[in-house]
A protein has these predicted regions:
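Glycine/small-residue-rich loop that forms an oxyanion/phosphate-binding "nest" at active or ligand-binding sites
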Residues: 133-136, 140-144, 152-153
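Hydrophobic alpha-helical transmembrane segments
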Residues: 1-128, 149-152, 157-299
Length: 299
């Protein structure tokens, strides 16, 4: 029978538990406390850098998604220019939305033409027609008579002119016809993802190399990306395109996007003295159309 007044030897907080295994401290006569567990290894500088890098990528993605789309995005603070490496990721999301709409339309029996029209409309809605607006403004400004100051003034005008309206009609027709020609949902989805990723992936390159047409406005507020950001954007866009379509088709599509970018950039330098937010929108739209036209012949 156990004595109720005797301390429980299994109680690690009692006196008996203290002196059961540990020898007494000669200075105090009390049992020395048991050594606790060894502390675990602390994360080294490489692990911390990895965590910080992942956090920076997440921040850049949310920043670009919130800027380029109307989708609910986590509000974050940061520089849009330095987040430029995530431009293709936001484009990929837009392409996924368009591809999903096309797939659903195709599954319920819509024709390829009508499903393509709905897919293009969905991408315009999800982006708030941000780039389409830039294309229309640039075409209106290029169609006006006058010098650089006059053209820049027209770029600020939010009203849609004849040239801008025609540009939107032709751009929509080209995109819809290209998607309808691909027909198969898997081809259309891949083409949309590649086109939207690549057409946004070239924008940091323009922003890092061209002069601003004016010191204020959306483009000026975004800042100038570093060359490293521009190259990262191109690499990520190409990787996304390779996964979405095929390596050869993705490479040709990137070259088509770069060619369209170079042509619009040269024109903008002569006509506006540099680039603006509207010019970037026009570059995205022309690059997107060039990519889709090339993909029709390749996939």
């Amino acid at each position: 029978m156990t004595d109720p007044n005797q301390p429980d030897k299994d109680d690690k907080t009692g006196a008996a538990g203290e002196s059961a295994d540990a020898p007494p401290d000669p200075a105090t006569g009390k049992a020395a406390p048991e050594a606790g567990p060894e502390p675990g290894p602390k994360p080294g500088p490489q692990a911390s850098a990895t965590v910080n890098s992942l956090a920076a990528w997440q921040r850049d993605f949310w920043l670009c998604l919130g800027f380029f789309t109307r989708l609910p995005a986590k509000p974050v603070a940061g520089s849009l220019a330095e987040a430029g490496r995530a431009f293709p990721l936001a484009g990929m999301v837009v392409g996924l939305v368009g591809g999903l709409v096309y797939y659903l339309g195709f599954q319920i029996g819509l024709s390829a033409l009508l499903a393509a029209l709905l897919a293009v409309a969905a991408t315009g809605i999800v982006t708030g027609a941000l780039h389409e607006d830039g294309l229309a403004d640039v075409c209106d400004a290029l169609g006006a008579r006058g010098g650089v100051a006059k053209r820049l003034e027209i770029l600020r005008d939010s009203r849609l002119g004849s040239y801008g309206g025609l540009a939107l009609v032709f751009a929509t027709a080209i995109k819809v016809a290209s998607l309808a020609a691909l027909a198969a949902p898997e081809l259309v989805g891949g083409a949309l993802i590649a086109a939207h990723a690549l057409s946004r992936g070239v924008l940091p390159l323009v922003m890092s190399r061209m002069d601003l047409a004016r010191p204020e406005g959306l483009a000026a507020g975004a800042g100038r990306p570093s060359p490293a950001v521009a190259y990262w954007s191109l690499i990520i866009a190409l990787v996304i395109a390779i996964i979405a379509v095929a390596p050869v088709a993705a490479l040709v599509a990137l070259l088509a996007a770069l060619a369209a970018t170079w042509l619009v950039a040269r024109l903008a330098q002569r006509q506006f003295g540099g680039y603006t937010g509207d010019v970037l929108g026009a570059i995205e739209q022309l690059a997107e159309m060039a990519i889709l036209i090339n993909l029709v012949t390749l996939i």
